[in-house]
A protein has these predicted regions:
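Active-site-proximal, substrate-binding regions of enzyme catalytic domains
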Residues: 2-254, 264-290
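Conserved residues at the C-terminal ends of beta-strands
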Residues: 261
């Protein structure tokens, strides 16, 4: 039986919060777990509590190091895809990082194989994790980023659709359809600005790359905020949490599932799987560059 690779939300890395993870570890040897790069950024963001957070978060998995994998960060995927026009979606696991993590897990379990790896994470001598945390947890920048997507979507949608969203007259299926119709058009603007020929842009999107998944995810989130209202007055940290959650969701669409305690993340995951099960364009091959 092939292995199942399940993405774990960082909030499920504590034993008292994750009975389903404990059950899988003890009874389902073909179930493996994937930690996205963002999980380590979350674990290391607070320098004063870094060791305690790392040990506490990794203790649950420490007895099963050979069933744990690491997934590439989304920003690295986007850079690679835009440079090569090749999808990263089927090449997310990182062998070198996986081996480092497994040594670290053995150390957390009481061994000494990865002591130097753990110490390097804790001390962060080159400020690698501190720099990443500053980038990912820039709350104001994150709110501005999502606000830009919301503004673009408002301009693209008919006023009647916006009214239906605000009045909560559209169900989840209808919201997903809006994303399906709009994402390729918005992504086309990026390709056009980079001078990508239409045929290459079409072929690239057919591969369901990470950047298409990002556009789907951001539009789903934008629609949720348009419908709920209150974005302008929302605390920037709330938006950061939304975007961090969606990193887990997007990553999980490349594997076999997601374990999280957040229903809205499960809903977003199911919406993305729905979108990815369909052709990349609503029609056979529209002229996306016009």
């Amino acid at each position: 039986m092939p292995n199942r690779l399940i993405v774990l939300d960082q909030n499920k890395l504590r034993e008292d919060r994750a009975p389903e993870v404990v059950h899988a570890l003890q009874n389902e040897p073909n179930t493996h777990f994937v930690l996205p790069d963002i999980a380590f950024i979350e674990m290391t963001k607070n320098a004063d509590h870094r060791e305690r957070t790392l040990r506490g978060s990794l203790r649950l998995l420490a007895q099963y190091p050979n069933r744990v994998h690491v997934a590439k960060g989304l920003q690295d995927c986007f850079k690679s895809e835009l440079f090569t026009l090749e999808s990263s979606a089927n090449r997310l696991t990182l062998r070198e990082h996986r081996d480092n993590l497994r040594r670290l897990l053995r150390t957390v379990a009481g061994g000494d194989e990865g002591v130097s790896d753990l110490q390097r994470l804790i001390e962060d001598p080159d400020n690698h994790y501190s720099t990443l945390a500053d980038q990912y947890f820039d709350d104001l920048a994150n709110k501005n980023r999502l606000g830009g997507v919301i503004d673009a979507l408002k301009k693209a949608l008919p006023e009647s659709t916006l009214k239906d969203l605000r009045a909560k007259r559209l169900n989840r299926t209808e919201r997903v359809e809006i994303v399906y119709q709009r994402a390729p058009r918005l992504l086309a603007g990026l390709f056009k600005g980079r001078g990508v020929p239409e045929g290459k842009a079409w072929s690239f999107q057919k591969k369901k790359p990470m950047i298409l998944r990002e556009y789907y995810s951001m539009l789903l989130l934008a629609i949720d905020w348009i419908s709920a209202g209150g974005f302008e007055n929302a605390a920037p940290k709330t938006i950061t949490n939304d975007l961090i959650d969606h990193e887990y969701v997007i990553t999980a669409t490349c594997f076999d599932g997601l374990i999280t305690g957040e229903k809205r993340m499960i809903d977003a995951y199911n919406d993305l799987r729905n979108l990815l099960s369909r052709p990349s364009y609503p029609t056979a091959k529209p002229n996306i560059m016009n």
